[in-house]
Amino acid sequence: MKTKITLSGFAGTGKSTVGKRIQEQLNFEFVSVGNYSRQYAMEKYGLTINEFQEQCKAQPELDNEIDEKFRLECNSKENLVIDYRLGFHFIKNAFHVLLKVSDESASKRIRLANRSDEVTSTKAIQQRNQKMRDRFQDNYGVDFTNDKNYDLVIDTDDLTANEVADLIIEHYQKSNAVSKIPSVNFHLWQPCNMRCKFCFATFLDVKQEYVPKGHLPEDEALEVVRKIAAAGFEKITFAGGEPLLCKWLPKLIKTAKQLGMTTMIVTNGSKLTDSFLKENKAYLDWIAVSIDSLDEENNIKIGRAITGKKPLSKAFYYDLIDKIHQYGYGLKINTVVNKVNYKDNLASFIAKAKPKRWKVLQVLPIKGQNDNKIDAFKITDEEYANFLDTHKDVETIVPESNDEIKGSYVMVDPAGRFFDNAAGTHNYSKPILEVGIQEALKTMNYDLDKFLNRGGVYNWNTNKNQDLRKEEVSYE
């Protein structure tokens, strides 16, 4: 997994501005050989950068000295974005980017940035660029303008600095993708205000053994999200427990969105307020509401009720769905088919609700999660098939049998560990924040074919899922 990004290119490509934007988005440290040279010249020789550059003309070995020191420092660290034309040559374990710009655009950008110490005519820029190219070829025998030296080459003429940064982040994350399955469910919050008796993600074991509060601290949860994004996952679903009990859920959603992921929450709906819907519409793409039945008595039997006693009404669900549509979210409905509701007919409700996806899951026994109560809710394959047959005319239905569920989801538990359920129990990795994404994934048993066959890849980039990172930033 590459832990650094290097930026190369001629003057006027906006390397510094782009680098700082990437720093903000990926929480990387931004370093530049120019800033390093200024500091080094003053601390070691007591010279300004202009004085030092004049001395380098008489003593070319000083350039080599800077490159050697800078190379060693950068290679000793991780999570860097590096403004360095020779980064492709000297920096290891990095994603190398070349930024291109026409001489005319470079001249205009330098003038607009009011960099009084730089010449701005196109002829002067051409001469400066050629001298730079010749110097690197003479000193190191490399051509920093050769596209073949880079992982990504971008023509920046018609792009803003933000657009360039976004392209780099997108390609960097894809290059680092360590999972063939592009989506992940982060069960960040173990506590829940409902008491579904068949719940196959209670995480009582996790709470008892690892996180007594049932969740990570805010800063650690944010770091898990950053690492998930950096690993190349394209979509993240925040689940629980009940994720809306988490006060910092909006921060996690915003961070995930700014890092380029499609965002979703899975909620029982009881805490989905107008204020949440209004305040998060810029960063949250999808809302999945868990609705097993519209019959309040059935929901009490199931436990899908607040504290297990207060079910949500049919009117509540209809009103909630209207609000979700009103604010422009992509709507998904999840229904767990079990012994209590397998004879229900929800076709009329689904027709009115108009979800883009109606996921219909066969209730799933998971050892260590729902052993004590699952027997009363298990259904046969035939009973599950009957429910599907009742709703065969629903176009948006997405069935998931027990076999299709097991091993087909990439999931993270409330302690920040990957887990799978392929063997009918939870198998946990080491914590992501201790060993990293790649190492944590090694012990997981995820099945790409199952993921694809159950429809795990779909058009989650809806019109709601637009790029919200493009706040205009001028080149400096």
From Swiss-Prot:
Question: What cofactor(s) does the depicted protein rely on?
Answer: [4Fe-4S] cluster
Query: Which of this chain's residues are annotated to bind [4Fe-4S] cluster?
Result: 192, 196, 199
GO biological process terms, alphabetically, are: defense response to virus
Where along the sequence do coiled-coil regions lie? none
**Radical SAM core domain spans which residues?**
176-400
**At which positions is ATP bound?**
9-17
Among its keywords, does the record have Phosphoprotein? no
Reported EC number(s) for this entry are 4.2.-.-
PROSITE patterns under this entry? RADICAL_SAM
What are this entry's molecular-function GO terms?
A: 4 iron, 4 sulfur cluster binding; ATP binding; lyase activity; metal ion binding
The UniProt catalytic activity note for this protein reads: GTP + AH2 + S-adenosyl-L-methionine = 3'-deoxy-3',4'-didehydro-GTP + 5'-deoxyadenosine + L-methionine + A + H2O + H(+)
Q: One Pfam family for this entry, by name?
A: Fer4_12
Superkingdom is Bacteria
Name the NCBIfam families for this protein.
viperin_w_prok
Known role:
Expression of pVip60 in E.coli (strain MG1655) confers resistance to phage T7; prevents culture collapse upon infection. Catalyzes the conversion of guanosine triphosphate (GTP) to 3'-deoxy-3',4'-didehydro-GTP (ddhGTP), probably via a SAM-dependent radical mechanism. The modified nucleotide represses transcription from T7 RNA polymerase-directed genes (possibly by acting as chain terminators), strongly suggesting these nucleotides block viral polymerase transcription.
Q: What is this protein called?
A: S-adenosylmethionine-dependent nucleotide dehydratase
Highest lineage ranks of the organism?
Bacteria, Pseudomonadati, Bacteroidota, Flavobacteriia, Flavobacteriales
